[in-house]
Every structure is written in structure tokens, then in C-alpha cells.
């Protein structure tokens, strides 16, 4: 195929040359055309090689794009292609607005339907942990029976008693029925109006302003007038400061009385 024919097919027929130009210019233009023809031939050969390479590259890029659109489900090991939905940009101006609304309304429905096919139901136990597919779902296996709960409570009580001391164990071994009897008897004695006519000192109980029981036997005084509680064992454990304080106060008061009585009237 001649170069002139190729150029005429690709770029169209050449324009007629001006006949008024001189012959010298024509000879120079012929020489320049020969040089340009050689350059064009070289460029054509390089362009063909580049097109062949680009064609191979385009095929490889197209294959890569196809492979990117393919995704694998790890649970079922199945390959599937991504679904392409017609977007608003691909729609031509000839289509109406109603078609656009229908397509946009169908897009979320299709995606939800596809997700429901691929996803599987996840089962969880009472604590929120996932259950494997092999294990069957059984409510009785999750909920503990009453017998197991009672056994666990007995085990906890046994461990508590095992770690307790003798004094704590003695406090535990009190019958609840006796407690109720004592409470009812105390309530009856409080509510009975005839108790005011009796003179039994044992039934009168000393209480503080807050209603707490006080020590019913004689106890040493202190400068704050605080009485010991009912649980005091009667052992005096102070360093003797309170006794010295009261002795000093008595001495000061006696001196005041003596100084007043020994005064002479003038």
C-alpha cells in the first residue's frame, strides 16, 4: 500500500498546488516531502507496534477488571459476579422521569434480596455467644433446671460455712421460729397498758435518744455523759484521765465554795 494512498484515505485528498509558485520552490518542497514521507513511515511503524502492545494491555486490563468484579463466598466457596444496576448517569435523555423513579425504587429491593440469599441466620445463646451450625438449638440446654440451681446454692452455702469461725457459726445456729416468738412477745409487752402498774425492774429497758439499748448496770462516768451500750462487757479500759478530770473539777468547786463562805462582811 502506497503512502500517498494511505494518507488520502485517512486525511482526505490533497489540495491542488499553486501554479504561480516558482520551480525552485517546487524542487525544495519535493525534497522536504521526501523527508517527511520517511518520517511518517517510521512513525506509522512505531504506531502499529504501540497499538499491538496497547491491544494486549487492554485485553489484560479488561480481564483484570472482570476478575475484580468476581467475589467469593467464604462459607459456600462459590464464585459470583457483581450485579451492575443501571444508574441515573447511564440513562439517556429520551427516557422519562417515571423510568428513573422506578429504577431507583428497585435498586434497594434487589440489593436486599441478594443479601438475604447469601447471609445465614445466626443463633445465639442466653449469654449472647454465637452457636455453631452443628449444634442444635434447644432451649432446655440453655436454661438451667431448678435442681441444678438448688445444688449450686447448697454448694455456695457449704463453702461459706467452711470459711467461718466458731463465733460466726454460733450466731448462725439460731432458730428463726424463736426469733419470731421473741418479736411477738416484745410487741405485746409494749402494747399492753397494764405493764405500767407492774414494778418489775427486769422489764424496764434503758434506751438512748436514738432508741438503742444501753448498759443496765452501773458504769463509770465520763465528761460527755455518754452511757455504754448494751453489749459492753464491763471491763474498764481507759487510762484514768476521766477520773482525774472529775477529781480536779470537784477540787475547783470546793475551793470556790470555801472562798465564798470564808469571806468577811464589812
Swiss-Prot record:
Main location: cytoplasm
Biased composition, class Basic and acidic residues, residue ranges: 122-149
Location(s) in or outside the cell: Cytoplasm; Nucleus
Compositional bias segments (type: Basic residues): 16-26
GO cellular component: cytoplasm; nucleus; Prp19 complex; RES complex; spliceosomal complex; U2 snRNP
Chain segments carrying region Disordered: 1-37, 118-149
Keyword RNA-binding recorded: no
Keywords: Cytoplasm, mRNA processing, mRNA splicing, Nucleus, Spliceosome
GO biological process: maintenance of RNA location; mRNA splicing, via spliceosome; U2-type prespliceosome assembly
Domain of life: Eukaryota
Family: Belongs to the CWC26 family.
Quaternary structure and partners: Belongs to the pre-mRNA retention and splicing (RES) complex composed of at least BUD13, IST3 and PML1. May also belong to the CWC complex (or CEF1-associated complex) composed of the U2, U5 and U6 snRNAs and at least BUD13, BUD31, BRR2, CDC40, CEF1, CLF1, CUS1, CWC2, CWC15, CWC21, CWC22, CWC23, CWC24, CWC25, CWC27, ECM2, HSH155, IST3, ISY1, LEA1, MSL1, NTC20, PRP8, PRP9, PRP11, PRP19, PRP21, PRP22, PRP45, PRP46, SLU7, SMB1, SMD1, SMD2, SMD3, SMX2, SMX3, SNT309, SNU114, SPP2, SYF1, SYF2, RSE1 and YJU2. Interacts with IST3 and PML1.
Role summary: Required for efficient splicing and pre-mRNA nuclear retention. May also be involved in positioning the proximal bud pole signal.
The name this protein goes by in its record: Pre-mRNA-splicing factor CWC26
Amino acid at each position: 500500500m502506497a503512502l500517498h494512498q494511505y494518507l488520502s484515505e485517512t486525511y482526505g485528498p490533497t489540495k491542488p498546488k499553486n501554479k504561480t509558485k516558482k520551480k525552485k520552490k517546487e524542487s525544495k518542497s519535493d525534497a522536504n516531502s521526501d523527508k517527511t514521507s520517511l518520517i511518517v513511515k517510521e512513525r506509522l511503524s512505531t504506531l502499529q507496534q504501540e497499538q499491538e502492545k496497547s491491544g494486549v494491555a487492554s485485553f489484560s486490563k479488561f480481564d483484570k477488571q472482570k476478575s475484580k468484579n468476581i467475589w467469593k463466598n467464604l462459607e459456600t466457596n462459590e464464585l459470583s459476579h457483581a450485579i451492575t444496576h443501571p444508574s441515573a448517569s447511564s440513562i439517556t435523555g429520551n427516557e422519562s422521569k417515571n423510568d428513573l423513579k422506578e429504577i431507583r425504587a428497585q435498586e434497594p429491593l434487589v440489593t436486599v434480596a441478594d443479601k438475604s440469599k447469601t447471609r445465614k441466620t445466626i443463633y445465639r445463646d442466653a449469654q449472647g455467644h454465637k452457636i455453631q451450625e452443628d449444634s442444635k438449638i434447644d432451649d432446655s440446654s440453655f436454661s438451667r433446671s431448678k435442681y441444678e440451681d438448688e445444688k449450686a446454692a447448697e454448694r455456695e452455702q457449704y463453702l461459706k460455712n467452711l470459711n467461718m469461725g466458731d463465733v460466726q457459726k454460733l450466731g448462725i445456729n439460731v432458730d428463726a421460729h424463736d426469733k419470731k416468738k421473741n418479736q411477738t412477745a416484745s410487741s405485746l409487752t409494749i402494747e399492753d397498758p397494764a405493764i405500767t402498774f407492774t414494778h418489775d425492774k427486769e422489764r424496764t429497758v434503758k434506751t438512748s435518744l436514738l432508741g438503742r439499748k444501753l448498759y443496765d448496770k452501773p458504769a463509770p462516768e465520763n465528761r460527755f455523759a455518754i452511757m455504754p451500750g448494751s453489749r459492753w462487757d464491763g471491763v474498764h479500759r481507759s487510762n484514768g484521765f476521766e477520773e482525774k478530770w472529775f477529781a480536779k473539777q470537784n477540787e475547783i468547786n470546793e475551793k470556790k465554795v470555801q472562798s465564798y463562805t470564808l469571806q468577811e462582811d464589812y
